[in-house]
Amino acid sequence: MSSKELQEGQDGLVEKLVSVRRVAKVVKGGRVFGFSALTVVGDGEGRVGYGSGKANEVPVAIKKAMEKARRNMKDVHLDGGTLQYPINFKQGAANIVMLPASDGTGIIAGGAMRAVLEAAGVKDVLAKCVGTTRPVNVVRSTVNALTGMSSPELIAAKRGKSVEEILGE
């Protein structure tokens, strides 16, 4: 299922539904069906979170996933509307490649990765996922790759140097 923007919540967060799956539990009398939902929540200004929820009904599963995503928000250090530097990130079978792009490029990424980037507030990026394309793995890997990115200001503060020394200007 493609990512859908549900609404902008009462707290100003962008909420996106990435996937809904029907899951089955096999019991003695047959199968018991339920639903699993994966959602992404972000403020569009550098904070993003994801969550998954399970329930017997789709709306309840989505609500649980949204609550978990809100509790799981993380900061992303962006450079304007794009990334600080190119990212190659590997987690499990997912291999994430993201490149900063010039203004006006837009978000060139597929499905689940696009939902995360839009919710985080990234405006211009080139991105690709090699390996697994399962939405849960792609979302988890993309969020971890984005949160692992550091700004030059943070690196300079850690090293006790000025930003000019770090950037070599």
Curated annotation (Swiss-Prot):
InterPro entries referenced in this protein's UniProt entry, alphabetically: Ribosomal_Su5_D2-typ_SF (IPR020568), Ribosomal_uS5 (IPR000851), Ribosomal_uS5_bac-type (IPR005712), Ribosomal_uS5_C (IPR005324), Ribosomal_uS5_N (IPR013810), Ribosomal_uS5_N_CS (IPR018192), Ribsml_uS5_D2-typ_fold_subgr (IPR014721)
Gene3D superfamilies referenced in this protein's UniProt entry, alphabetically: 3.30.160.20, 3.30.230.10
Molecular function as annotated in GO: rRNA binding; structural constituent of ribosome
Keywords of the record: Ribonucleoprotein, Ribosomal protein, RNA-binding, rRNA-binding
Family: Belongs to the universal ribosomal protein uS5 family.
Domain comment, as recorded: The N-terminal domain interacts with the head of the 30S subunit; the C-terminal domain interacts with the body and contacts protein S4. The interaction surface between S4 and S5 is involved in control of translational fidelity.
Protein name (database record): Small ribosomal subunit protein uS5
Organism encoding this protein: Hydrogenovibrio crunogenus (strain DSM 25203 / XCL-2) (Thiomicrospira crunogena)
